[in-house]
């Protein structure tokens, strides 16, 4: 950090009141992406941070190195020094740390409440939507950083250029991913809100009623001040439908002819995307984006729309997108397999909704037309598999080889007929593809070793622990013999 940035940070800190009577902030489930990001920013602001999780990971190691007290396992004693306890909705209310905190009258708050506190005295930019939040947050962060604006950011995944998912910046800007999964994004009061798209997901939160979900997004946008800005993707049918109900200033973006910020002339070559962005009363931008897919071009256009409103220099926008390294587990190219007679490419992707899987397949096809596409898919949550069963079957039918794992439950109880084996039967019955069901992830390396061919593109897909498998394979330098031995 430069001397000038240190002075700017000092000035910002004088404007932001410290949280009174708060000395130690404890995070239950601190190893998660969303929780760890907030914890890291608060740690850098000078608060004493502690946290617990079930196991060590790279995030807990980094936080411990920065001075946080990390506990493994959940025990009442972990919150003895806490002034406030931060939890996510994934944490059971019977957790002994939550119980102990309530018994001792220690405030227990949701992670979004703490994020809202960070945003309260800053120029907040909140990125919401069913898909694309993490990448759009990373893209916006990259542009603002390239422009020298040094934003604070809190993302749901790794911002590769920064090497972290959160950082305390020296400016007034805070860029954050806004989570609709538990409706907690309603706590946020940003200056700018992006909505990338709206689809039926996390419907248990909304009582299974899509109208409730749509109204919640409207309520989120109405948390903007009257002088705030909503940036909305007009290509999305639901977003377009909601536009007349938004009583805030709106900028639309997309491929559509009537978009305020319009994307045209898209093409993809390998991992790079090329397109032009047209802006009202501004010079057109010829973009080279260093990640593939039309969906990512849309994500970048959202970031461009926000940056343009802030009068960020075009040169910074162009440079940031050209040099953008991506977001963690978003079409993450991890290396190559040695197949014995050549090589196969390994890509890891977090997408776990049919729409996300579909755009990932399309990006792979567009950039690597000559490769056979081998997908290892791990369904995420029984409820999502049940609710979107036919959509999953339709999308997964579009790869060349499908290896299906069982559902990553994320704490849910099994639902009959909503598992990996059932999906395999449904897809097989259609006659186009013969999926291979692998009941345990430990058995996958040896299965994979017998399937991979020269020039394949192997895609690990899902939000569960399939990503850990991808890293494990990459750490073995993706050697076929090593995979056979691992299996």
Curated annotation (Swiss-Prot):
It holds the Pfam family Mur_ligase. It catalyses: UDP-N-acetyl-alpha-D-muramate + L-alanine + ATP = UDP-N-acetyl-alpha-D-muramoyl-L-alanine + ADP + phosphate + H(+). Keywords: ATP-binding, Cell cycle, Cell division, Cell shape, Cell wall biogenesis/degradation, Cytoplasm, Ligase, Nucleotide-binding, Peptidoglycan synthesis. It is found in: Cytoplasm. The gene is murC. Cell wall formation. GO terms for biological process: cell division; cell wall organization; peptidoglycan biosynthetic process; regulation of cell shape. It is an enzyme of class 6 (ligase). It comes from the Bacteria. The lineage of its organism: Bacteria, Pseudomonadati, Pseudomonadota, Gammaproteobacteria, Vibrionales. Its EC number is 6.3.2.8. HAMAP family: MurC (MF_00046). Pathway: Cell wall biogenesis; peptidoglycan biosynthesis. GO terms for molecular function: ATP binding; UDP-N-acetylmuramate-L-alanine ligase activity. GO terms for cellular component: cytoplasm. This is UDP-N-acetylmuramate--L-alanine ligase.
């Amino acid at each position: 950090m430069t001397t000038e940035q240190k002075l700017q940070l000092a000035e910002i800190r004088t404007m932001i009141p410290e949280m009174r009577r708060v000395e130690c902030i404890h995070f239950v489930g601190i190893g998660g992406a969303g929780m760890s990001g907030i914890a890291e920013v608060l740690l850098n602001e000078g608060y004493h941070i502690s946290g617990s999780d079930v196991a060590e990971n790279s995030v807990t190691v980094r936080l411990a190195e920065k001075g946080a007290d990390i506990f493994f396992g959940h025990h009442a004693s972990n919150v003895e020094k806490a002034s406030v306890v931060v939890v996510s909705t994934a944490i059971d209310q019977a957790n002994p740390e939550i119980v102990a905190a309530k018994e001792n009258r220690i405030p227990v708050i949701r992670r979004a409440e703490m994020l809202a506190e960070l945003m309260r005295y800053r120029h907040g930019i909140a990125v919401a939507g069913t898909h694309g939040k993490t990448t759009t947050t990373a893209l916006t962060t990259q542009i603002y950083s390239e422009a020298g604006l040094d934003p604070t950011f809190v993302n749901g995944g790794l911002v590769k250029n920064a090497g972290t998912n959160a950082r305390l910046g020296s400016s007034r800007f805070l860029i954050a991913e806004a989570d609709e999964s538990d409706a907690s994004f309603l706590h946020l009061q940003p200056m700018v809100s992006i909505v990338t798209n709206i689809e039926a997901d996390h419907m248990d939160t909304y009582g299974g009623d899509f109208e409730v979900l749509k109204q919640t997004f409207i309520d989120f946008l109405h948390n903007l001040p009257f002088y705030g800005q909503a940036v909305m993707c007009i290509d999305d049918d639901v977003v377009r439908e909601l536009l007349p109900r938004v009583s805030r200033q709106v900028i639309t973006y997309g491929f559509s002819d009537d978009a305020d910020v319009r994307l045209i002339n898209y093409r993809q070559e390998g991992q790079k995307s090329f397109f032009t962005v047209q802006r009202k009363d501004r010079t057109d931008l010829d973009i080279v984006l260093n990640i593939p897919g039309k969906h990512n071009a849309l994500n970048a256009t959202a970031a461009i729309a926000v940056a343009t409103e802030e009068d960020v220099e075009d040169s910074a926008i162009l440079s940031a997108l050209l040099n953008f390294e991506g977001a963690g587990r978003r079409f993450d190219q991890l290396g190559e397999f040695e197949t014995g007679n050549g090589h196969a490419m390994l890509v890891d992707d977090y997408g776990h909704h049919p729409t996300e899987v579909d755009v990932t397949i399309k990006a792979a096809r567009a950039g690597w037309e000559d490769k056979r596409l081998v997908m290892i898919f791990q369904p995420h949550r029984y409820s999502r598999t049940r609710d979107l069963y036919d959509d999953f079957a339709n999308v997964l039918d579009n790869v060349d080889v499908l290896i299906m794992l069982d559902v990553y439950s994320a704490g849910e109880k099994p639902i009959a007929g909503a598992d990996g084996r059932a999906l395999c039967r449904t897809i097989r019955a259609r006659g186009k593809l013969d999926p291979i069901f692998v009941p345990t992830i430990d058995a996958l390396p040896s299965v994979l070793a017998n399937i991979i061919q020269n020039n394949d593109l192997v895609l690990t897909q899902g939000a569960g622990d399939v990503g850990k498998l991808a890293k494990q394979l990459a750490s073995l330098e993706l050697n076929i013999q090593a995979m056979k031995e691992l299996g």
